[in-house]
Regions:
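Phosphate/pyrophosphate-binding loop motifs in nucleotide- or prenyl diphosphate-using proteins
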Residues: 1-171
């Protein structure tokens, strides 16, 4: 199967909902997909900067981002349990760190800096999905998952600095 089809050369693409539909490439659905795809790619880069013990968590998140995209277009296995799993990860990581008492500058170790990039891209994806939901039916689980994921990514960024022995820099 070829990667190119030439059908999108004039600015439209095919998406799948209950049936295949052609939309402009700047459609809110395509924008939401793109933001989640960018986030997924950044999380892949983050995985390249962490120890092996953290990679399964990030790969699960990447799979869930695919499910979030599927939820927008057709069907998904993304559930409240996936949100609760993120909350559990946040709680477990938070217990292993000093309390957060101020805003901190994004950065520190490579893994922390990349986690902060992921967090910012996640927030953009969340905003795109909220805009999309004003025009299309988007399952609430997608909104909640992206919101919780940005919380996880902030916590994970802090934790990567703790593991690397890098002090956070307060604002």
């Amino acid at each position: 199967m070829k990667i190119y089809t030439r059908t999108g050369d004039k600015g439209s693409t095919q998406i799948y909902a209950d049936k295949a539909v052609r939309v402009d490439k700047d459609d809110l659905v395509v924008q939401s997909y793109g933001d989640m795809d960018e986030l997924n790619s950044h999380i892949g880069l983050l995985a390249a900067h962490v120890t092996d013990k953290h990679k399964p968590i990030l790969q699960d998140i990447q799979r869930n981002l695919f499910q979030a995209g599927f939820a927008i277009s057709a069907s998904s296995t993304l559930t409240q349990t996936d949100i609760e799993n993120l909350e559990s990860l946040i709680d477990n990581i938070t217990r292993q760190m000093p309390p957060n008492t101020s805003f901190v500058l994004p950065g520190g170790s490579k893994a922390s800096a990349q986690a902060h990039v992921c967090r910012a891209v996640c927030r953009r994806a969340e905003r795109a999905v909220i805009s999309l939901s004003k025009h299309y039916d988007v399952p609430e689980v997608v909104h909640a998952y992206l919101n919780r994921l940005s919380d996880f990514l902030f916590t994970f960024a802090r934790f990567m600095n703790v593991e690397a022995g890098v002090d956070e820099v307060p604002v």
